[in-house]
Curated annotation (Swiss-Prot):
Together with the chaperonin GroEL, plays an essential role in assisting protein folding. The GroEL-GroES system forms a nano-cage that allows encapsulation of the non-native substrate proteins and provides a physical environment optimized to promote and accelerate protein folding. GroES binds to the apical surface of the GroEL ring, thereby capping the opening of the GroEL channel. Pfam families: Cpn10 (PF00166). This is Co-chaperonin GroES. Belongs to the GroES chaperonin family. NCBIfam families: PRK00364.1-2, PRK00364.1-6, PRK00364.2-2, PRK00364.2-4, PRK00364.2-5. The gene is groES. Heptamer of 7 subunits arranged in a ring. Interacts with the chaperonin GroEL. It is found in: Cytoplasm. It comes from the Bacteria. CDD domains: cpn10 (cd00320). It comes from Symbiobacterium thermophilum (strain DSM 24528 / JCM 14929 / IAM 14863 / T). Keywords: Chaperone, Cytoplasm. GO terms for molecular function: ATP binding; metal ion binding; protein folding chaperone; protein-folding chaperone binding; unfolded protein binding. The keyword Transmembrane does not apply. HAMAP family: CH10.
């Protein structure tokens, strides 16, 4: 994938949740919750303040992050699903460990 997000945007590959319940029932797509975790695939250069100072994002490529449930724009690139998020507003936390 060759995508470079602009500004403070981040490209995320959502992590899919289990498609079966603990009792073994297969969940249809309509019953699945939207993923809220994903892996950072690409990071924009950050935001520019009015003074001209560049503010880089705290996340980097390879980080696993938790993001707002209905945030971002879903896109399909090379047949794969991705979400483009505002890296400052939509990403809530970096998963460590």
């Amino acid at each position: 994938m060759n995508v470079k997000p602009l500004g403070a945007r981040v490209v995320i590959k959502p992590l899919e949740k289990e498609e079966r319940t603990k009792s073994g029932i297969v969940l249809p797509d309509t019953a699945k919750e939207k993923p809220q975790q994903g892996k950072v695939i690409a990071v924009g250069p950050g935001r520019t303040l009015e003074s001209g100072t560049k503010v880089e994002l705290e996340v980097k490529e390879g980080d696993t992050v938790i993001f707002s449930k209905y945030a971002g724009t879903e896109v399909k690139i090379d047949g794969e699903e991705y979400i483009i998020l505002d890296g400052e507003r939509d990403i809530l936390a970096i998963v460590q460990g």
